[in-house]
Amino acid sequence: MRNSTFKFPMKKIVQIYLILFFGVCINLNSQSKGFRLIGAQNSYQDISFQFINNLIVIPIQVNDKKLNFILDSGVSKTIVFNSSRADTILSNFQNKYKLKGLGEGLPVNAVISKNNLFKINNLIAVNKNVYVVLKDDFDLSSKMGITIHGVIGYDIFSDLILRINYKSKKIRFYNPSQYKQKICSKCEVLPITIFQKKPYIDLSLKLNNNSKIIPIKMLIDSGGSDAIWLFEYSNEKIVTPENFFTDFLGVGLSGTVYGKRSRISSLGLGKFLLKKPTVSFLDTLSTKEARRFNKRNGSIGTGILKRFTVWFDYPNNRLMLKKNNFFNEEFNYNMSGLEVVYDGKILVEELSRNYSRGRGETPDPNGNRNYIRLIKSYEYKFKPNFKINDVLKGSPADIAGVMKDDILIKINGNPAYNFQLHEIISIFHKKENNLIRLTLMRNNKKIKIQFNLKKII
């Protein structure tokens, strides 16, 4: 969409630095009102969320339109993508901004939309500012399998206490003035620091069994699907282990992000100790803006957080954790080397079997006049289509011959359109040596490829 579609003054160009990997950080001085529970008797509000690719997706009504937002504690301002539709939802566009994304590419343009109304059941935020990315090809939706309109973070965390239950997929938003913290002997309460509208926590790690414990300061990033990101050499002891491989980590506004994926011996969160977590080491160039807070050593994402029921308590600068049934699950990763994305819809012919009952005039040899008749018919339905967006060099899929832009037809004998995207991705995270059988379409020809999942780290 051309910038001219938005009617905003061009008097002022502001340089902003944004860091995005399903998480965003913008440094701005403008203020907008946070969320409040309406109704004097309302001490909390419960909502359900979708948990897709290790990310929380919540429905928010924006100016009477229902939109899907990723809940991202690493976001200092609310961001909306897909500018070609934004002007049908938002209004009052002002000022053009330059956003610098994670990666090595160039900044992208955005505009601010003011005085918007946000509503989540009994949670209301008025006069909210929204930043609209003027780049339609930045498409989170294709990587999530559902439409994602934006990301929201500090604006919803700042004035409420959130309890996130990853097992039940529910969030409870508490009114801080009416919240009473219960005694929980199985919980761990950890202090957090809010710096530039983002939460940081002091943790500890061991790179290997023989190394010493290293104290680290980490961003708490509910919008990061990985377990741990570490900034290489942010501490002289933080170096990539010998056993690693280069992996696709995500897409920022400024391009694709890769890192060195490995494992460390353990991560300590107070009294909780997580063993053998996966970790991605990022270099200085791709994380230049993220390192502006020079005390930061990296971030913990949902790969860690989902193992707990988590209380985010910004008003009291604390985080409370209670381990859940996911705590002891093995830390796995995509062992196929494939990045699969949603690629629109296709029309599929499906066989429908119906039965009709009746009573005939002439009885059968047993004197029975009743009958059941099978009626076959065909229905045409739109189903999701998936394609291969990237293949890691040297991975099992690469060695087997899978190529970028191949269309995914079948997985292990089942039509790909019967899966949701996150279900396909989860297949590649399962046990080592699992056989993966793919039917692909390439240049209008069907090809069959198979390979075994291989654990490198």
How should these model regions be labeled?
Residues 1-35:
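Bacterial Sec-dependent N-terminal signal peptides
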Residues 28-457:
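Pepsin/retropepsin-fold aspartyl endopeptidases
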